[in-house]
Amino acid sequence: MKVNMEYTKEKKVGEGTYAVVYLGCQHSTGRKIAIKEIKTSEFKDGLDMSAIREVKYLQEMQHPNVIELIDIFMAYDNLNLVLEFLPTDLEVVIKDKSILFTPADIKAWMLMTLRGVYHCHRNFILHRDLKPNNLLFSPDGQIKVADFGLARAIPAPHEILTSNVVTRWYRAPELLFGAKHYTSAIDIWSVGVIFAELMLRIPYLPGQNDVDQMEVTFRALGTPTDRDWPEVSSFMTYNKLQIYPPPSRDELRKRFIAASEYALDFMCGMLTMNPQKRWTAVQCLESDYFKELPPPSDPSSIKIRN
């Protein structure tokens, strides 16, 4: 289906709450593209806020590890976003046990992910929904941070925010506690959980609901206390919690048997309970984990199937 002089929609490849995604072609280059058609008719006041956010933030960012917004056009009263075509995602790769990947491959994927996240944070943008199926692969093996439907500008210190963001399994403890003020540290927590999942090849903190998510998180990583996170006990739900000790280093070694000491340091830095002590994207990128052998794989050499 020809949608304007420059683009053709070829087949539907996905559908979400506010958009339908088509595989398409850019005529002038022959390039494969994805066309995200925003369902404006679904919303009485016009565009859904998620669509507005996605357009706003993708227009502001150009980076090799962030999905590229190529163009925007209107057709039949619908807004269409033209995005680079990214054939698969990290969730598919983790789940497909026929795909074998190495510690060097994981290191390459983490490096690309953190470069994309750092670019967001450097531009004062919180992603707020980092998870494996929002990390997409380009045909040459680059990981691209995608889906900015929950993104927002990093807030002023006293600005009140919703804590109902980030897919549950990747939600930082401050969000689980219902914090109304938070920082880019929420994205780093999500990356830490993704790293653990890559090493285990199963979900690391799979809570069944919001209450169970707290139980699962603190059973795995220890219940935070005022000693390591001042005033954490002032959150309303804190007194209902079971107190679990943090895992010992030996317990972490047994859980993550292929992880080096630097890899465990790297993971623990991202999964620090106190958001003010949690590593930043810069600290992650400067970690000894990336300096030790093996070096990160060349992304184009990693064999993944679509």
Curated annotation (Swiss-Prot):
EC number: 2.7.11.23
Keywords associated with the record: ATP-binding, Cell cycle, Cell division, Kinase, Nucleotide-binding, Nucleus, Phosphoprotein, Serine/threonine-protein kinase, Transcription, Transcription regulation, Transferase
Residue list for modification Phosphothreonine: T162
GO biological process: 7-methylguanosine mRNA capping; cell division; cellular response to nitrogen starvation; nucleotide-excision repair; positive regulation of Atg1/ULK1 kinase complex assembly; positive regulation of autophagy; positive regulation of transcription by RNA polymerase II; positive regulation of transcription elongation by RNA polymerase II
Reported effect, T162 to S/D/E: No effect on kinase activity
Transmembrane region(s): none
Subcellular locations according to the entry: Nucleus
Active site positions, chain numbering: D129 (proton acceptor)
Family matches, as PROSITE patterns: PROTEIN_KINASE_ATP, PROTEIN_KINASE_DOM, PROTEIN_KINASE_ST
Superkingdom field: Eukaryota
KW Nucleotide-binding (keyword) present: yes
A single GO molecular function term of this UniProt record: cyclin-dependent protein serine/threonine kinase activity
Main location: nucleus
Ranges where the Protein kinase domain occurs: 7-290
Keyword RNA-binding found: no
Function: Catalytic component of the TFIIK complex (KIN28-CCL1 dimer) which is the protein kinase component of transcription factor IIH (TFIIH) and phosphorylates the C-terminal domain of RNA polymerase II during transition from transcription to elongation after preinitiation complex (PIC) formation, thereby positively regulating transcription. TFIIH (or factor B) is essential for both basal and activated transcription, and is involved in nucleotide excision repair (NER) of damaged DNA. TFIIH has DNA-dependent ATPase activity and is essential for polymerase II transcription in vitro.
Assembly: CCL1 and KIN28 form the TFIIK complex, a component of the TFIIH holo complex. Component of a complex consisting of KIN28, CCL1 and TFB3. Interacts with TFB3. Also interacts with HNT1 and HOG1.
Family: Belongs to the protein kinase superfamily. CMGC Ser/Thr protein kinase family. CDC2/CDKX subfamily.
Protein's name according to its UniProt entry: Serine/threonine-protein kinase KIN28
Organism encoding this protein: Saccharomyces cerevisiae (strain ATCC 204508 / S288c)
Taxonomic lineage of the native organism: Eukaryota, Fungi, Dikarya, Ascomycota, Saccharomycotina
